[in-house]
Amino acid sequence: MTQNRAELNRNLAQMLKGGVIMDVTTPEQAKIAQDAGACAVMALERIPADIRAAGGVSRMSDPAMIKGIQEAVSIPVMAKVRIGHIAEARILQAIEIDYIDESEVLSPADDVYHIDKNQFDVPFVCGAKNLGEALRRIAEGAAMIRTKGEPGTGDVIQAVRHMRTMNKQIRELVGLRDDEVYEAAKQLAVPYDLAKYVHDNGRLPVVNFAAGGVATPADAALMMELGAEGVFVGSGIFKSGDPAKRAAAIVKATANWQDADLLAKLSENLGEAMVGINEDEIQTIMAARGE
C-alpha cells in the first residue's frame, strides 16, 4: 500500500464519522439498516450474541452471503476476518469488500501477529482497549479504530472503559514535554512518529468509533459524549423487539447526542431491548483477544 493509498483509506473512514455501522446477517436486515440511516453495514453469518452463545470456532463468513448483502444495499459493506488470518483478508479484498474488520469477535487465527494491513488496498478496521493497542494497529495499517467492548452482551460498560482509558492516555500524552514523548512511545510500545502525532494533535490519526454492548439510543449518545466519532451496533438491533424502529432511533441519537429532549422521544416505545448479559456474569472472552 502506497502512502497515498494509506491517506485515501483514512479519509474514506473519516466519511463515516458521526454515523452508525450495524451488524446484519441477511440482505433483508441490510435493507432495514440502510433505510434506518446506517452509514455502513457489517455482514456476518451470526451476530456476536449468537457467536458467544454457540461457542466453538468462529470464522470468516461465506463470501456468497456477503455478496448477497453487497448487492442488496448501496451503502458500504464491511466484513470480519480472524485476527492474523491473511488468506481470509485476501478473499474479502478479492470480492471487493469496502472495509475489513480484523475482529476479536471471531476466533483468532494467530495469537502473536496481526495482519500486515499495509499489504492491502482495502481499508481495515481494528479494535483497541487502550492507546497502545490503537497505535500498534495503526502502525500495521489500520484506517479506523473502534473500542473492543465485550461483544454480544448488550452491556456497554467495557466500551465505556476502553473509550475513557484511550482518551485519558491521549490527554496524558498531550501534556508531556516534547523530549518526554520518546519515553512515552517506548512505554506504549508504539512508533515514535505516531506518539508524536497524538502529542501534537490531541487525537488518533484515524477515526475512533465505539463498539461492544451498545443496545439503546442512550448508549449510543453516551459513547458520543465520551468522545466516540461514531458507533458500531451489533446484537442490540436485531435481537430487540422492533429492529427497524430501534435502528432509526440509534442513528438519530448518534447524530443528535447533545439533544436530551430528542433522546427522550427517541427512547419511547422501542419495543423490548435485547436481554443482554451483565459483565459480572461472564468471563471476558473477546475483548482480551489480540493486544
From Swiss-Prot:
PROSITE patterns: PDXS_SNZ_1 (PS01235), PDXS_SNZ_2 (PS51129). It catalyses: aldehydo-D-ribose 5-phosphate + D-glyceraldehyde 3-phosphate + L-glutamine = pyridoxal 5'-phosphate + L-glutamate + phosphate + 3 H2O + H(+). It is an enzyme of class 4 (lyase). The keyword Lyase applies. Keywords: Lyase, Pyridoxal phosphate, Schiff base. One of its GO terms (molecular function) is pyridoxal 5'-phosphate synthase (glutamine hydrolysing) activity. One of its GO terms (biological process) is pyridoxal phosphate biosynthetic process. D-ribose 5-phosphate binds at D23, G152, G213, G234, S235. Its EC number is 4.3.3.6. D-glyceraldehyde 3-phosphate binds at R164. The active site is at K80. InterPro entries: Aldolase_TIM, PdxS/SNZ, PdxS/SNZ_N, RibuloseP-bd_barrel. It holds the Pfam family SOR_SNZ. Gene3D superfamilies: Aldolase class I (3.20.20.70). The keyword tRNA processing does not apply. Pathway: Cofactor biosynthesis; pyridoxal 5'-phosphate biosynthesis. Catalyzes the formation of pyridoxal 5'-phosphate from ribose 5-phosphate (RBP), glyceraldehyde 3-phosphate (G3P) and ammonia. The ammonia is provided by the PdxT subunit. Can also use ribulose 5-phosphate and dihydroxyacetone phosphate as substrates, resulting from enzyme-catalyzed isomerization of RBP and G3P, respectively. In the presence of PdxT, forms a dodecamer of heterodimers. Belongs to the PdxS/SNZ family. This is Pyridoxal 5'-phosphate synthase subunit PdxS. It comes from Bifidobacterium longum (strain NCC 2705).
